[in-house]
């Protein structure tokens, strides 16, 4: 069967939520509104290209006019899974439903986990708090070099990171320690998405992380639409942190990125490639640099920079291409705390072959995106999700 669209370009604007989800209160997120609050904070957002697609038609956002004739089909999606982290949102987009949320540790890891890690590795743990990776090695690197203690830290995502100097703890030993941590955190009460080895070199005041980082992720808990595409011989091009999020499952080519703008450069490159399948981009800066840091000005600037790159995408899209723009959760930079927020996410679906867009019904799960991609390529449909392919005219 010939696919309806030869290439699908899926962009996940990491953490760009569009207002509190119906169950936001359960997550301590009542009133969260990533896009709305950023726009309000700066007296409006200037995003003319997203405006043309129909962003403000989903719901009005200050500074972004409603399109009289939106180019895209538009709606918002509600997350069905339990959780509001990157892995849960992305796995659901590709047809899975996660009922046990990944754990985050804003106050560091529980004492019993740290005690067990110390016991099994024979090394003391220092740190045990959320931190920037470069800041914590500057702070604790000298003590680590003296004592051989493990620098353990986390972030706002579901990760346990272990930093060690390559001359103090050789790489193979660090990797062995991370495998122990991975085993310990498979326990449901800890359920950590990723364990990361973070080796570094240098001297106090001049430490540098090396390229010998290693991730011990969880494989998705079931087959995703990406697995089905790969097995059917289609291309699945993962741009940014997509390959890490799915532990390389269902990925045929990986393009790493340094920033949102680098991600857009790589996307433009894939638009010029001849392939049949999915190009899947995650733009992480919104979340990592601005959402968690509660920086609404920086977040707004990044949204406007992203919008300014969209004409390069539009002019390279072919008649039989499909562009899908969405998000994986919220991260309201005006909200309390530093964590993600439980929100609806926007959904904009565009192809040059469309004769204008209109409103789609509210989606009750992110998995509708995966189901639509699966139907387009004629591969096995995911267990969750309802395709909207036939609603696109």
Curated annotation (Swiss-Prot):
Cystine crosslinks: none
Amino-acid positions noted as binding Mn(2+) 1 in the UniProt annotation, renumbered to this chain: 14, 328-329
CDD domains, per the entry: PPM
Enzyme class: isomerase
Location of the protein in the cell: Cytoplasm
The keyword Isomerase appears for this protein: yes
Pfam family, one: Metalloenzyme
An example Gene Ontology CC term for this record: cytosol
Cofactor remark: Binds 2 manganese ions.
Keywords per UniProt: Cytoplasm, Isomerase, Manganese, Metal-binding
EC number of this enzyme: 5.4.2.7
Binding-site positions, Mn(2+) 2: 287, 292, 340
GO molecular function: magnesium ion binding; manganese ion binding; phosphopentomutase activity
Function: Isomerase that catalyzes the conversion of deoxy-ribose 1-phosphate (dRib-1-P) and ribose 1-phosphate (Rib-1-P) to deoxy-ribose 5-phosphate (dRib-5-P) and ribose 5-phosphate (Rib-5-P), respectively.
Name listed for the protein in its UniProt record: Phosphopentomutase
Native organism: Geobacillus stearothermophilus (Bacillus stearothermophilus)
Source organism phylogeny: Bacteria, Bacillati, Bacillota, Bacilli, Bacillales
């Amino acid at each position: 069967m010939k696919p309806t669209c030869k290439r699908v370009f899926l962009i996940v604007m990491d953490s760009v939520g569009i207002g509190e989800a119906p169950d936001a209160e359960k997550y301590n997120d009542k009133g969260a509104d990533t896009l709305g609050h950023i726009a309000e904070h700066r007296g409006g957002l200037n995003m003319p290209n997203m405006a043309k697609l129909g962003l403000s038609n989903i719901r009005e956002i200050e500074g972004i006019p409603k399109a009289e004739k939106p180019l895209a089909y538009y709606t918002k999606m509600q997350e069905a899974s339990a959780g509001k982290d990157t892995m849960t949102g992305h796995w659901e987009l590709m047809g899975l439903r996660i009922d046990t949320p990944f754990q985050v540790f804003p106050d560091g890891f529980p004492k019993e986990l740290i005690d067990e890690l110390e016991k099994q590795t024979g090394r003391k743990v220092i740190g045990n708090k959320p931190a920037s990776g470069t800041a914590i090695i500057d702070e604790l690197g000298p003590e680590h070099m003296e004592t051989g203690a493990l620098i353990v830290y986390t972030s706002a995502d579901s990760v346990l990171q272990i930093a060690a100097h390559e001359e103090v703890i050789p790489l193979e030993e660090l990797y062995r320690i991370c495998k122990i941590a991975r085993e310990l955190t498979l326990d449901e009460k800890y359920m950590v998405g990723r364990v990361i080895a973070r080796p570094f070199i240098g001297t106090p005041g001049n430490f540098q992380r090396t390229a010998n980082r290693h991730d011990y992720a969880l494989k998705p808990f079931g087959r995703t639409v990406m697995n089905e595409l790969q097995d059917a011989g289609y291309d699945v091009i993962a741009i940014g942190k997509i390959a890490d999020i799915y532990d390389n499952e269902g990925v045929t080519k990986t393009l790493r990125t340094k920033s949102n703008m680098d991600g857009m450069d790589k996307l433009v490159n894939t638009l010029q490639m001849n392939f049949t399948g999915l190009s899947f981009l995650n733009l992480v800066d919104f979340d990592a640099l601005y959402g968690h840091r509660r920086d609404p000005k920086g977040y707004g600037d990044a949204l406007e920079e992203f919008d300014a790159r969209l004409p390069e995408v539009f002019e390279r899209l072919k008649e039989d291409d499909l562009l899908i723009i969405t998000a994986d959760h919220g991260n309201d930079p005006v909200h309390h705390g530093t964590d993600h927020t439980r929100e609806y996410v926007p959904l904009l679906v565009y192809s040059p072959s469309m004769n204008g867009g209109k409103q789609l019904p509210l989606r009750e799960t992110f998995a509708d995106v995966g189901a639509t991609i699966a139907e387009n390529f004629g591969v096995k449909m995911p267990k969750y999700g309802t395709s909207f392919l036939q609603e696109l005219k």
